[in-house]
Amino acid sequence: MEFLSNKPLLITDTILRDAHQSQAATRMTLEDMLPACEVLDKVGYYSLECWGGATFDSCLRFLNEDPWERLRILRKALPNTKLQMLLRGQNILGYKHYADDVVDYFVKKSIDNGIDIIRTFDALNDLRNMEKAVKATKAYNGTAEVAMSYTTSPVHTEEYFVKLAQDIEAMGADLICIKDMAGLLLPFNAYSLIKKLKAHTKLPIVLHTHNTAGTGAMTILKAVEAGVDVVDTALSPLGGGTSQPATESIVAALKGTEYDTGLDEELLAQIAEHFRGVAERLTKDGWRDPDKVLSVNAKALQYQVPGGMLSNLIGQLKQANAMDKYYAVLEEVPRVRKDFGYPPLVTPTSQIVGTQAVMNVLGGERYKMVTKESKGLLKGEYGRLPAPVNEEVRKKCIGDDKVITHRPADDIAPELEGYRKEIRQYSQQEEDVLSYALFPQVAEKFLAIRDGK
């Protein structure tokens, strides 16, 4: 599908991945998806995001599904639509850095089993953490979409993102995605940024946002006027709120204009009817709280904190019986973030900064207690931080420990063969070793049940 200079707008629907990850704790099953696939395949989407992110973990841990089998079945059910996944660079779909051989094999197997487009991101926008995944995507004939984690800070200027986009282009990416995971990108800022990206790079631009702060659809509209090529939306039963703006609304808003998506509204209505039932079940089962996921959270804008991180902080404070410290913690988050060199707040940095802010407030003294993860971040174990850290804080947290400046994965020896030996008794399929590499205990339990051992 070629990218035209302004029209029509191309749509990636997130209904099979980020929509339920954002609204219903990633609990949608393959059974929920399959009845809609035949019609989904006729709509004419640019792509369907259906795999990666938290779905892999959720399949194994909660749904007793093999994520690889889910992908193969979706591939068969959606023969005419590009399938897309979200990959965390060197973290793959786990929560730590993996060796290059594991990253390479994971990308190969994702593409072998039916993925067309791999959107890769890194929480710190450290391109060294994405290099291997992007090279592998290209080597195995996938489409490499590289994401910039969007955030606001004194260092995250338009110039910063333009330079990052140029580096991404030089790296061999096919598309550049602005990944606004917290819904912080405001409409006129989006317009200005996309105009600049269009002027300084030749690659198509994709916008991924959330409606957490109530500004998502406006941001998409301004992005469209600025010439964005593709936007992420979610079908209405799981659209809006903490998810993406609703597909049907964007399609209707652009109908009859030069940006007309050309998507069939009748078909969208049919599919939405099916997913309404799915959303109702997810609500009934307690995985989706409409009041929470659909209410506008303006605090996200005020404190630059993603919606998921807010609920996490509330959980930690309730556990500590310290809800009266909520606003003190919200005010501490930006201070910790500044001390740590302004990391974007997305997995895993959102958890690291949030937990440290809670400890600083509850401990009565800043950095009296420091988590292992905070120390790792300050030591460079997660990659290069966007700005210089507060050296006084670093000294207090890690003393004279050595700070690494090279790519963290350079320290990791090949791991694949070791993992293969460890799960010899289970291997029904080559992909099992990857499930085990990412989530050893969870995968072993799943494989034992599957193989009747």
Write out the residue ranges for each language-model feature.
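N-terminal amphipathic alpha-helix/helix-capping segment at the start of soluble metabolic enzymes
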Residues: 1-24, 76
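Hydrophobic faces of well-ordered beta-strands that scaffold small-molecule active sites
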Residues: 10-18, 46-50, 81-89, 116-119, ...
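Terminal or standalone catalytic/regulatory effector modules within metabolic enzymes
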Residues: 35, 41-59, 292-300, 304-453
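Active-site beta->alpha loop and helix N-cap motifs at the rims of alpha/beta catalytic domains
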Residues: 52-169, 173-176, 183-187
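Glycine-rich phosphate-binding active-site loops on the catalytic face of alpha/beta enzymes
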Residues: 120-123, 180, 226-243
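Catalytic cores of alpha/beta
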Residues: 156-168, 213-229
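C-terminal helical cap(s) of enzyme catalytic domains, especially alpha/beta-barrels
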Residues: 239-261
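Phosphate/diphosphate-binding loops
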Residues: 261-275
